[in-house]
């Protein structure tokens, strides 16, 4: 049986932690931030851990883990 390909978009956007959780950047930080307060901007800086249901879907895009 042939090897499975990893979705290149998922490879660029998600990282798998040592415990198997998925980390991803937070959406909505590129432009039009004037209307948001500082707390919103600060809390959405960096990465967040994905939910369990999203993790199951995204892991199917990365069959070998990366």
Swiss-Prot record:
Signal peptide from the UniProt entry: none
GO molecular function: structural constituent of ribosome
Swiss-Prot/TrEMBL GO biological process terms: translation
SUPFAM superfamilies in the record: L35p-like
InterPro entries with a match to the protein in the record: Ribosomal_bL35, Ribosomal_bL35-like, Ribosomal_bL35_CS, Ribosomal_bL35_sf
Alphabetic keyword roster: Ribonucleoprotein, Ribosomal protein
Gene3D superfamilies in UniProt: 4.10.410.60
One Pfam family here: Ribosomal_L35p
UniProt GO cellular component terms: cytosolic large ribosomal subunit
UniProt xrefs under NCBIfam families: rpmI_bact (TIGR00001)
HAMAP family from the UniProt entry: Ribosomal_bL35
Family the entry assigns: Belongs to the bacterial ribosomal protein bL35 family.
Identification of the protein by name: Large ribosomal subunit protein bL35
């Amino acid at each position: 049986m042939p090897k499975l390909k990893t979705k290149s978009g998922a490879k660029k956007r998600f990282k798998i932690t040592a415990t198997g959780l998925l980390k991803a950047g937070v959406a909505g930080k590129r432009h039009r931030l004037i209307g948001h307060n500082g707390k919103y901007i600060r809390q959405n800086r960096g990465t967040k851990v994905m939910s369990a249901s999203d993790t199951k879907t995204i892991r199917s895009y990365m069959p070998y883990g990366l």
